[in-house]
UniProtKB/Swiss-Prot annotation:
EC number(s) reported in the record: 4.3.1.3
Pfam families: Lyase_aromatic
Single GO term (MF): histidine ammonia-lyase activity
Organism listed in the record: Burkholderia ambifaria (strain ATCC BAA-244 / DSM 16087 / CCUG 44356 / LMG 19182 / AMMD)
Modified residues (2,3-didehydroalanine (Ser)): 142
Keywords annotated in UniProt: Cytoplasm, Histidine metabolism, Lyase
Membrane-spanning segments: none
Cross-link 5-imidazolinone (Ala-Gly): where in chain: 141-143
Key word Lyase present: yes
GO biological process, one term: L-histidine catabolic process to glutamate and formate
Chemical reaction(s) catalysed: L-histidine = trans-urocanate + NH4(+)
SUPFAM superfamilies for this protein: L-aspartase-like (SSF48557)
Protein name according to UniProt: Histidine ammonia-lyase
Length: 507
């Protein structure tokens, strides 16, 4: 059980919400603020004075006054008309994060929503009744309207859900959770819809995957150093301390730790080779830069996870209703775009190491890592697959945040595209996973070919894991299943856990 303290969520909590079957409860200390916000909205609605989002239309229709007897209909219509998402359902892990983030935002007491509505969301979450949310349809301002409308429609008994993974109607989902359809009061529909929770959830969910890939890439890169009989001298701490970048210093330390005591490395310590290619030698510089970007993105996304991104905002202590733009997800878009650059670069560097290993003139290994080259092609086309994926990632890494299209009759004339920026991270991460799987296979093959010398004590379990699932490549065979089984192990963090390094979300 995780107790949500609105405004004080942590990255480890968010990772657990996404990755584990934890349940949620709301910190009772938040109840007074929630109740005060709801009362403030009820008082404003009772007075009948125009207040945006409470008794007016929305967007370009903000100047249209809504009579008091139509306020409930206004909120219902808002939810139903905005549930216009398309595409595949959002991943279960992202939906869980989305609901938790929405609860945190509402729980800070500036949205004017009743606890009854929040309790219904928690009940659905804990019953594993998750809204079916189409993943496409948000431009990241005014908030993530369409995705959050699909979440909110379930509270009304409209739409679809997944009941413990099985697709069903919203009404069936409410019944399983022991709930009845809600009637939303003034502003409650808008409070549910307005916010950056979809883009932030997608960005966080994919960031956690990219963090795992980063750690896997450290391991794969270190194994490739041994496979290529590379030097460990470029990882000397003194080099990196002179430059001063924290990520670079930390990455170099990880490579030193992983390669410490390698018999392969000791066997060629006194060779006449002067310098390794950049894909080996400059790993701390490249991976360190990726690490710095990822850490900054995590800081931004944690702030956003704890933010109130509703509009308008209710200030119960003064009774004021202030319209602003906290729904504009530009910080999320920038963070996601930076994560895309890092994830694509992790894959790009791994692809270069694969290319190095299969090139006999660079690695000193048999061409394409196989004996009897010619009749056997070995890793030749596996590298082509890695190259295809790395190239695709370069296109996917183009920033989404530089684009904008005006909506709502030019009332909402600049948008963030944060949801797309966050969503495409999943494709980049998936591609990078397969690139790393191919590198792990190639590096393991190279290490085998360095016999009788072995890799380091820290990397020996990696070799054992790989060889426990895929045999040494002797002759050409149907190769795709080998890549698939190692990619599955990458997804399961089998190699990431070997890296002597952890992110804030894992602590």
């Amino acid at each position: 059980m995780i107790t949500l303290t609105p405004g004080h969520l942590t990255l480890p909590q968010l990772r657990k919400i996404a990755r584990e079957s934890v349940q949620l409860t709301l910190d009772p200390a938040s109840f007074a603020k929630i109740d005060a916000g709801a009362k403030a909205v009820a008082d404003i609605a009772a007075k009948g004075e125009p207040a945006y989002g409470i008794n007016t239309g929305f967007g370009r229709l903000a100047s249209t006054h809504i009579p008091h007897d139509q306020l409930e209909l206004l909120q219902k219509n808002l939810v139903l008309s905005h549930a216009v998402g398309v595409g595949e359902p959002m991943a279960r892990s992202s939906v869980r994060l989305l609901m938790a983030l929405k609860l945190s935002s509402l729980g800070r007491g500036h949205s004017g929503i009743r606890r009854e509505v929040m309790d219904a969301l928690i009940t659905l979450f804990n019953a594993d009744v998750l809204p079916l949310i189409p993943v496409k349809g948000s431009v990241g301002a005014s908030g993530d309207l369409a995705p959050l409308a699909h979440m909110s429609a379930v509270l009304l008994g409209v739409g679809e859900v997944f009941i413990r993974g099985e697709r069903a109607s919203a009404l069936d989902g409410l019944r399983v959770a022991g709930l009845a359809p809600l009637t939303l009061q003034a502003k409650e529909g808008l409070a549910l819809l307005n916010g950056t929770q979809a883009s932030t959830a997608l960005a966080l969910d994919n960031m956690f995957s990219i963090e795992d890939l980063y750690r896997t890439a450290l391991v794969a890169g270190a194994l490739s150093v041994d496979a290529a009989a590379g030097s460990v001298k470029p990882f000397d701490a003194r080099i990196h301390e002179l430059r001063g970048h924290r990520g670079q210093i930390d990455a170099a330390a990880a490579y030193r730790d992983l390669l410490d005591g390698s018999p392969i490395n000791q066997s060629h310590r006194d060779c006449d080779k002067v310098q390794d290619p950049y894909s080996l030698r400059c790993q701390p510089q490249v991976m360190g830069a990726c690490l710095d970007q990822m850490r900054h993105a995590a800081d931004v996304l944690l702030i956003e996870a704890n933010a109130v991104s509703d509009n308008p905002l209710i200030f119960p202590d003064t009774g004021e209703v202030l319209s602003g733009g906290n729904f504009h997800a530009e910080p999320v878009a920038f963070a996601a775009d930076n994560l895309a650059l890092a994830a694509a670069e992790i894959g790009a560097l791994a692809e270069r190491r694969i290319a190095l290993l299969i090139d006999a003139t660079l690695s000193g290994l048999p061409p394409f890592l196989v004996k009897d080259g010619g009749v056997n092609s070995g890793f030749m086309i596996a590298h082509v697959t890695a190259a295809a994926l790395a190239s695709e990632n370069k296109t996917l890494a183009h920033p989404a945040s530089v684009d904008s299209l005006p909506t709502s009759a030019n009332q909402e004339d600049h948008v963030s595209m944060a949801t797309f920026a966050a969503r495409k991270l999943a494709d980049i991460a998936d591609n990078t996973k397969y690139i790393l799987a191919i590198e792990l296979l190639a590096a393991a093959q190279g290490v085998d070919l360095r016999a009788p010398y072995h890799t380091s004590p820290k990397l020996a379990p990696v070799m054992e894991t790989i060889r426990g699932h895929v045999a040494h490549y002797e002759l050409d065979h149907y190769f795709a299943p080998d890549i698939a089984v190692i990619a599955k192990l990458v997804s399961e963090r089998a190699f990431a856990k070997v890296a002597p390094f952890s992110f804030a979300s894992e602590q």
